[in-house]
Amino acid sequence: GDLVIIGRGDPNISGRVLPYALKTQRTPPHTQILEDMADQVARSGLKTVDGDVIGDDTYYAFERYAEGWALDDLQWSDGAPVSALTFNDNVVFINVLPGDRAGDKALVGVEPETGYYELDNRIVTSAAGVTRRIGIHRDPGAKKIVLWGTIPLGDAGTKETLAIEDPAEFVAQLFRTLLERRGITIRGKTRARHGEGAQFFVASAVASQQANVSEASAQDSALATNTPAAAGDNSLPSSAPVQGTPADISSSNKVLAEHFSTPLADDIRVINKTSQNLHAELALRLVGKLRGSGGSFEGGIAAVKQFLLQAGLKDDEFTFLDGSGLSRRDLVTPAATVQLLIYASRQPWGAAFEESLPVGGVDGSLADRFQNTPAVGQIHAKTGSLSHVNALSGYGQTAAGKRFVFSIFCNNHNMPGSKVLAAIDSIMQVLVGDGQAGKK
């Protein structure tokens, strides 16, 4: 039958080191979790799969992108698609090195290499000292990546990230490659199995975990066959085509391998410290799933709205269409943001939330800001950045030890982002200095 790898929303099937400390660290290979699962399958004694290798992400509704996301974001890591079967933040790495001589084609490769993407390499090696200029493009729905430009002799090379349009299909292809390296024969195709959208899931999703959010962070990615293998049988018999119904691990499936995620609290730090959009979107789906919506945008946003109203925000102070803030149609006022931060500070989980925020001059998205100023270590805040938009909201402490909450939004500006950030940072230094900056 088919061999199915089922995603349950774990965002950290990658080489990311957890818990997060100061900066993102990755331990190669970033395929290690899938390598371990492939080892489990090999140890099970399986030798042949007569059916297909299927990447199944039906645990969440099939809604890869949110309303209001810009088309030019979708090719890159910031706009990586949402999938219950997520690998490596749903990006591949494109490695580029210069050739041996000026005029030679550059050396390019995809990491991990699975044969899923075709590279059209038009990058030429230029003379030493010439500025590197590289362009990368993938059309929506295409598996050809076009690369062009120049890279000079002696250049150390570059690693670019490119979003994977169908993560479930990519994981299926990658896992097939790992199984074949272990001597397992695959006779069928490689494909993805998606759900039929939010409405389908509202009616049909199987709530396989009855748990609160912290317990449900141990979501698993498991391999299961849709028919049990007989005792001593080292092959999976052929089966009927899959119709796209929600998949789950049940008595009719034989589990060959499984992996459990790290605690959800670890990923909250990743989301807030590094502004990890995809992980924020997956957290939104998890909230919706636990509220019985089947893991849809709509269900997650409904739960968030209920929470915000409970926190004291007014209905006309916010509109959200995604979990990351990437949508241009997300709206919220600075006053509402301050109200939310005050509410959070008074909750039992408030201290943990504040600790998950970037620290000025120390880590995350604020590591390089406030350097050599009294504000270093005194600001715990979340950044927000889109083209023509910059924001900073969070908690601060003055030189006299007074704590304060703040939210600064700069919208629809046409200035270099560096100048806007400098202005925001100047405001923060005044606040941290008890308003003394600039006084004589």
Model-predicted regions and their roles:
Residues 1-315, 399, 422, 430-439:
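Conserved serine DD-peptidase/penicillin-binding transpeptidase domain
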Residues 32, 274-277, 281-440:
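Small-residue-rich helix-loop
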